[in-house]
Amino acid sequence: MTKTTRLTPGDKAPAFTLPDADGNNVSLADYRGRRVIVYFYPAASTPGCTKQACDFRDNLGDFTTAGLNVVGISPDKPEKLATFRDAQGLTFPLLSDPDREVLTAWGAYGEKQMYGKTVQGVIRSTFVVDEDGKIVVAQYNVKATGHVAKLRRDLSV
């Protein structure tokens, strides 16, 4: 099993270019000069991931007003992300990382505890990246329920 190196506030956010739900490439560099919430989740259309995505959807207006963009990343293929996006009415980008390279670079893939066992998988994580590409918030092992509300409080949104 692989232990991950976790990112911390002040670190430069690892660059990425990944396909979105429509197969178009999206890069972290596309958000240069803007703040962006990057969140990693295990699988589209599962109960916890759906709850988390819908919480981001329902709070997107407030995040946008506060100058924050939202991007979700999972190992799902673009086709599955498109189905998930359309079913849930998600309007922010969902990106596909099937090789888990970006997940690993951000410390969001590796050993985790699940039902009392150590397993290898996606570590539900959320980051806020500032206008200069630096991480200002790094949260690992977040809970799907209540996480977005906590993030709003932490960011005073």
From Swiss-Prot:
The active site is at 49 (cysteine sulfenic acid (-soh) intermediate). There is a cross-link at residues 12, 150 (Isoglutamyl lysine isopeptide (Lys-Gln) (interchain with Q-Cter in protein Pup)). Keywords: Antioxidant, Disulfide bond, Isopeptide bond, Oxidoreductase, Peroxidase, Redox-active center, Ubl conjugation. Disulfide bonds join 49-54. One of its GO terms (biological process) is cell redox homeostasis. Residues 7-157 form the Thioredoxin domain. PROSITE patterns: THIOREDOXIN_2 (PS51352). One of its GO terms (cellular component) is plasma membrane. Its EC number is 1.11.1.24. It holds the Pfam family AhpC-TSA. The active site is a conserved redox-active cysteine residue, the peroxidatic cysteine (C(P)), which makes the nucleophilic attack on the peroxide substrate. The peroxide oxidizes the C(P)-SH to cysteine sulfenic acid (C(P)-SOH), which then reacts with another cysteine residue, the resolving cysteine (C(R)), to form a disulfide bridge. The disulfide is subsequently reduced by an appropriate electron donor to complete the catalytic cycle. In this atypical 2-Cys peroxiredoxin, C(R) is present in the same subunit to form an intramolecular disulfide. Monomer. Belongs to the peroxiredoxin family. BCP/PrxQ subfamily. Thiol-specific peroxidase that catalyzes the reduction of hydrogen peroxide and organic hydroperoxides to water and alcohols, respectively. Plays a role in cell protection against oxidative stress by detoxifying peroxides and as sensor of hydrogen peroxide-mediated signaling events. NCBIfam families: PRK09437.1 (NF006960). This is Putative peroxiredoxin Rv2521. It comes from Mycobacterium tuberculosis (strain ATCC 25618 / H37Rv).
